[in-house]
A protein has these predicted regions:
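Short glycine-rich hinge loops at helix-strand junctions in the catalytic core
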Residues: 46
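Short glycine-rich His-centered loop
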Residues: 5-27
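Secreted/periplasmic proteins that engage bacterial cell-wall peptidoglycan
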Residues: 30
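Nucleotide donor/acceptor-binding cores
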Residues: 3-5, 74
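Glycine-rich beta-alpha loop elements in corrinoid/cobalamin-binding modules
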Residues: 34, 38-42, 50-172
Length: 172
């Protein structure tokens, strides 16, 4: 049975990409601080949220897909931050791999990315990565909450949300 939540915040796993074989035993696992902050911000105004920490749970893409299907979110948000300044860019490859996998599996929820890399290069990120529908500028707190107010994710509805870049078919 699906839960029908508003948004799932995903902390992507790129440990094998960063640490290669060392990740089997020695890779660090960061607390999903940014996912927790964003989730609580949305929860505090009445939205039903979930956090999926694919890094801590060491979930495969297939396992992640199954969990997302059970949650049945309106929106999927990849939180590509870290406590290290460079970790946003470092974690992008794992996040993009998973978002592409989900799009190829016909998960229909819009995919949002928030993080230091997409803040620095919002339009370039959308141009290069076709699996991403929306990127948030700044920390994403207010823009995500404003996106959650929208029932139908069309150009007309998204164009008035401040602090985002988004894809409308092939236009950014």
């Amino acid at each position: 049975m699906s839960e029908n939540i508003d948004i799932v915040f995903i902390t992507p796993n790129n440990s094998s990409g960063i640490y290669q074989e060392l990740s089997n035993e020695y890779s660090a696992i960061e607390t999903p601080t940014w996912s927790l902050l964003l989730a609580e911000s949305c929860r505090s105004v009445g939205h039903k949220v979930s956090i999926l920490d694919t890094l801590a749970e060491n979930l495969s893409d297939d396992q992640t897909e199954n969990r997302i299907k059970k949650l049945n979110p309106r929106i999927i948000c990849f939180v590509v931050y870290g406590q290290n300044v460079n970790s946003g860019t470092t974690n992008m490859s794992g996040a993009i791999r998973l978002s592409s996998y989900l799009k190829n599996k016909n998960i229909n929820a819009p995919i949002i990315f928030v993080g230091s890399h997409v803040q620095a290069l919002p339009s370039q990120t959308l141009e290069k990565e076709k699996s991403i529908d929306i990127v948030c500028l700044n920390e994403g707190v207010y823009s995500i909450r404003n996106i959650l107010k929208i029932k139908d994710f069309t150009f007309e509805n998204l164009k008035n949300v401040k602090g985002i870049y988004f894809r409308d078919k092939d236009k950014i």
